[in-house]
Amino acid sequence: MRLSWVIGGAQGTGIDTAANIFGNAVASAGYYIYGNREYYSNIKGGHSYFSLTISDKRVRSNTQKIDILVSFDAETVFQHFYDVKDILIYNKAVETTKIDAVQSMEPELAERIKDFLTKQGYETTVKGALEYASKNNVTLIPVNYDEIAKKVADEMKVPLSVTERVKNIVGITISYKLLGLDVNYLIEAINSTFKQDLYRKMNELAVKDSYDIVESRYNLKPSSKERRRFWLDGNTAVAIGKIYGGVRFQSYYPITPASDESVYIEAHQDVLMEDPITGDKKKGTIVVVQAEDELAAINMAIGAALTGVRAATATSGPGFSLMVEGLGWAGMNEVPVVITYYIRGGPSTGLPTRTAQSDLIFPIFAGHGEFPKIVLASGDHAEAFKDAIWALNLAEKYQTPVIHLVEKTLANSYSTIPYEELELDKLKAERGKIVESGDISYKRFKFTEDGISPRAFLGKATMYYTGDEHNEEGHISEDVVNRTMMYEKRMKKLEVADKEIPEESRVKIYGDLNSRNLIITWGSPTGVLRDILEESNFDFTLLQIRMFSPFPKNLVSKLMEGRDKIITVEGNYLAQTSLLVKMYTGKDVTNSILKWNGRPFLRDELEEALIKVIKDGEKRVVLNGGIYTSME
């Protein structure tokens, strides 16, 4: 069973909260869920929607087509009616609204929809869109949201303005009744979200007053399997990973989609802190600093790392661009700092609230000069949690910056994660070569066989840090022999990491290893491809790259042997993964499936693309799934 549910309305009206309540309630009934939220880069007024896929099996992707659409305004109907295939719940009050009256809709999109409705012989109104949907066998459910909100206000004896947002509860209640699940799961989800008795009572009344509007359509039954699962998004997964992994300093400058991670850490600051020397634990607080800009954020994190605490920062494309100078300083001074890089659409401000995979080559080679950095890329929420810990361990073990890549899709999507996938029993801190103190002979940058020097913390020994080239003590030096040796010392750490980190841990492989087709991907497209691999008849080996620096060149090269087609699937124009594969292995990728319109890969569009590539032999397929790009 697989069911697609979408809720949409004006930004700032509680769409995200309503979707999370609904998702929580469905997950509590034992179902797996994958959800993604899309929103405009303004605070209020633009169209916001949340897509959920519900399944009795593990699910990792959404589709273009929608089984149930819950809409509260005219724009949601216009934006999504074409993709609804079963049920459309709409606000009866907006039936006569003309598309030209929807001021928040982008004019290009409005023109496409008007043109489509006109050619199909319908009015360019909500009514016309609904008639088109009805003709295509969609069941329409009109709802008088204002009437129910007024009824609740009268029962609670509060102003109507207070009950305005119960309309969202009405929409998800009708949806829940259509699924046929026990309403008590929904009540529990509401009460776990709202803590004030007024709002709990108000929303419970909204459930009671709207539950009987429809009859059950899908008759889902609660799962009998008792399993511990988490329901969380990517930002939260990374934040929890950092907390669990022992981060003690987090700096940031607000930027979408990175800020939510730091906000979560700030709200959960009280932790047990472990002394890096003695191992003793005591209660403490994570320091979270909202800096004045990204330059300050990276330099604060570097300073904190020098004192011996696990330190990190989080940012996105424009912010990372500002951090590059600080990143180079950290590379020169072998500072174990972690940067969580949330990738969004660029260049410049670009698409602040939309996804991309265009920042892949950039972080690997960011900074002038050459210095080692480790670059990780998470593919799902469990990996995001574990990689946050892995990044902290790698940074301290190899005394080098670590960049953790998380796309906006992963950051702002939600999923149910089985408890065992987090592998908590396997997670531990690795702090590398730490010395308690140093005497007058201590050399912070001492030449060693593996390039990694014993690390003392500020205040524990005499040491010098500078952006200039330096000798073993840290004093500035332009001596040619020292320059060669110190340069090699730094770069050797990446070579050592390449030898010590098993290549098998830097990739994941799914499917039949003997398939004639190899798909190489990274990040969130992995989940879409895994769903296709498990539930469709496509024949391919799926290779997910989890670490780009050091690159797992030997394993990737071996997996490329004897294939008819080697295909990259990624969210950028240049097929950057194929460029890296060529650079590190000397072998060519034969085909690419690409997308850069700011929206995530959707399962149905990717299945169509695979047919074009695997069966028809197309070399390059560009996807454009989103709103009304599939209109004929």
Swiss-Prot record:
Effect after changing I255 to L/M/S/V: Significant decrease in the catalytic efficiency, while the affinity for 2-oxoacid is only slightly affected
EC numbers: 1.2.7.11
UniProt xrefs under Gene3D superfamilies: 3.40.50.920, 3.40.50.970, Pyruvate-ferredoxin oxidoreductase, PFOR, domain III
GO BP terms in the entry: response to oxidative stress
Record annotation: effect of changing Y253 to A/W: Loss of oxidoreductase activity
Result, substituting R344 to A/K: Loss of oxidoreductase activity
InterPro entries, alphabetized: 2-oxoacid/accept_OxRdtase_asu, 2-oxoacid_Fdx_oxidoreductase, Pyruvate:ferred/Flavod_OxRd, Pyrv/ketoisovalerate_OxRed_cat, Pyrv_Fd/Flavodoxin_OxRdtase_N, Pyrv_flavodox_OxRed_cen, THDP-binding, Transketo_C/PFOR_II
Temperature section of the record: Optimum temperature is 90 degrees Celsius.
Functional pH dependence: Optimum pH is 8.5.
Effect after changing T256 to A/S/V: Significant decrease in the catalytic efficiency, while the affinity for 2-oxoacid is only slightly affected
Residue intervals passing through the bilayer: none
Site positions for Plays a key role in the broad substrate specificity: T353
Pfam family, one: POR_N
Keywords: Cytoplasm, Oxidoreductase, Pyruvate
Localization: Cytoplasm
Record's catalysed reaction(s): a 2-oxocarboxylate + 2 oxidized [2Fe-2S]-[ferredoxin] + CoA = an acyl-CoA + 2 reduced [2Fe-2S]-[ferredoxin] + CO2 + H(+)
Annotated binding of substrate, by residue: T256, R344
Predominant cellular place of this UniProt entry's protein: cytoplasm
Top-level taxon: Archaea
Entry keyword Cytoplasm: yes
EC category name: oxidoreductase
Gene Ontology CC terms: cytoplasm
Annotated GO MF terms: 2-oxobutyrate synthase activity; 2-oxoglutarate synthase activity; pyruvate synthase activity
Described purpose of this protein according to its UniProt entry: Catalyzes the coenzyme A-dependent oxidative decarboxylation of different 2-oxoacids such as 2-oxoglutarate, pyruvate and 2-oxobutyrate to form their CoA derivatives.
Assembly notes: Heterodimer composed of an alpha and a beta subunit.
Protein name per UniProt: 2-oxoacid:ferredoxin oxidoreductase subunit alpha
Organism name: Sulfolobus sp
Upper classification of the organism: Archaea, Thermoproteota, Thermoprotei, Sulfolobales, Sulfolobaceae
